[in-house]
Amino acid sequence: MNLISIFEIVAFIAGLIAYKTIKPTFLKPIVFLLAITVLNEYLVIPYLVSFKKGFNNYGYNVFSFIDMATWFYLFYKINTKPSIRYFIITGAIVSLSYSFIELTFLKDWRQLHTDSFRVYELIIIFLSTYYFYQVMLKQYHNIFGDSIFWLCAGCFLLHLILFINLTMLNNGQYWNLKSSSFVQHILQNIAIFCYYCCITIAFVSCYYSKYLETKQKSRQVLYK
């Protein structure tokens, strides 16, 4: 088990522990997404690899649709502005449709849909940045207690780095570099590491906020 796998499992366990305290409650599907991630990584992918070489991408491609749909739903719930919600719905239809077309007609399911996935990444980067902008407009904002902020931070870092990585991979000249595979591997690990760290912090902030709330109520009862 590598370091990235450990952070992945830690994020999932943190989600299970903090599940009842997660606020806003519409963020709870992230815990189920992490459960599917763990099952995919440790059961589905190993089975597909043992079945036939190259079949592991089937698992990653199917999972990517679940992942994209989940995050589109979450960002839709996060944003209440009609124009942003319209953008999210349009972006979801375009990126999911493009992904299916790329996998079914332009490539095949044994290859990763890198082109369409980059479209999805640009949308997520924009939505995360828009949330940061909304936070900056406030006079005061408790970042640690804002689970949405940390989730957006994780999405922003993950997809920004992966977008750069996938763009470089599509450049034929990039592979002429001796260290290309090493750089690709390092960038991917950094992106995933940042993603799971931020998700874990989001769960910790939910749990800690609930702890402080309970503690404050106990004091109020004590001093009555």
Model feature map: region roles:
Residues 1-224:
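Terminal, non-globular segments
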